[in-house]
């Protein structure tokens, strides 16, 4: 009779996953600091990246070193932002955001993932028009809906979405209003469980059977690439068992 993974094996897998997540956060901190300076109070993108690091139990020392490398105080690698677009099986649109120090390597890895899973890469803008860029501040169930809604709208949010199935609430903002809305809500004692600027599809596409399997395989393969920061798609997540 076969045996399941050992405790050590599961720990190693967990450590590897955590290490990969830390690498992505450090790259985001590096690019944000290089673009907007090393002071998070004057750099909303850097503050968001650092908040993500803190919520993942990354030490402040690690983040500070990443900032210093980006601002030239310490020697470090320079990363650039690149975005790729394409289609997964079933006509599912996919956006892949990367931070890389080697574009040739990154595009080859991304193209290989699309090709191996039955998809294809497109040109710039080929699928981006199917998505909206927006800020999302997520709150767990239990927060007072009226209080949050009033504070969010007053702070400049575009919309407040309540999910009746679990009571969670999302506050939606324009990207350039994200920082001011977040700061206003935090100042009012309304701390989001998660906050980010992201892409959301205008409409979801349902897939099933082998197509769903291939779409999931592609998304997982892309997310596992070292240079990939975020992967967005317009697939109906319920179809993938998410």
Swiss-Prot record:
Any one annotated GO CC term: cytosol
Subcellular location, principal: cytoplasm
A Pfam family this chain is assigned to: Transcrip_reg
Origin: domain of life: Bacteria
Stored NCBIfam families: PRK00110.1, PRK12378.1, YebC/PmpR family DNA-binding transcriptional regulator
Family matches, as InterPro entries: Integrase-like_N (IPR017856), TACO1_YebC-like_2nd/3rd_dom (IPR048300), TACO1_YebC_N (IPR049083), Transcrip_reg_TACO1-like (IPR002876), Transcrip_reg_TACO1-like_dom3 (IPR026564), YebC-like (IPR029072)
Keyword Transcription attributed: yes
MF terms (GO), sorted A to Z: DNA binding
Location in or out of the cell: Cytoplasm
GO biological process entries: regulation of DNA-templated transcription
Gene3D superfamilies: 1.10.10.200, 3.30.70.980
Protein name stated in the entry: Probable transcriptional regulatory protein XCV3282
Record-stated family: Belongs to the TACO1 family.
Keyword Cytoplasm: yes
Disulfide topology: none
Record key words, sorted: Cytoplasm, DNA-binding, Transcription, Transcription regulation
């Amino acid at each position: 009779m076969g045996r399941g993974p050992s405790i050590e094996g599961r720990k190693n897998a967990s450590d590897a996953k955590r290490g990969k997540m830390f690498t992505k956060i450090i790259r985001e901190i590096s690019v944000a600091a290089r673009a907007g300076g090393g002071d998070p109070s004057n750099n909303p993108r850097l503050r968001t990246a650092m908040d993500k690091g803190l919520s993942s139990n990354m030490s402040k020392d690690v983040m500070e070193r990443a900032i210093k490398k980006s601002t030239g105080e310490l020697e470090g690698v320079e990363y650039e932002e690149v975005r790729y677009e394409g289609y997964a099986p079933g006509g599912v649109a996919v956006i892949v955001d990367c931070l890389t120090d080697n574009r040739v390597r990154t595009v080859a890895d991304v193209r290989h993932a699309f090709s191996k899973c039955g998809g294809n890469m497109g040109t710039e803008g080929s699928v981006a028009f199917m998505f909206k860029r927006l800020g999302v501040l997520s709150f767990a169930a239990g927060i007072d809906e009226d209080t949050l809604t009033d504070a969010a709208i007053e702070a400049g949010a575009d919309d407040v979405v309540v999910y009746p199935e679990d009571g969670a609430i999302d506050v939606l903002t324009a990207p350039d209003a994200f920082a001011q809305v977040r700061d206003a809500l935090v100042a009012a004692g309304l701390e989001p469980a998660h906050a980010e600027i992201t892409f959301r599809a205008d409409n979801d596409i349902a897939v099933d059977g082998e197509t769903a399997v291939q779409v999931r395989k592609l998304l997982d393969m892309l997310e596992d690439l070292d240079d990939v920061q975020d992967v967005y798609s317009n697939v109906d997540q319920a179809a993938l068992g998410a």
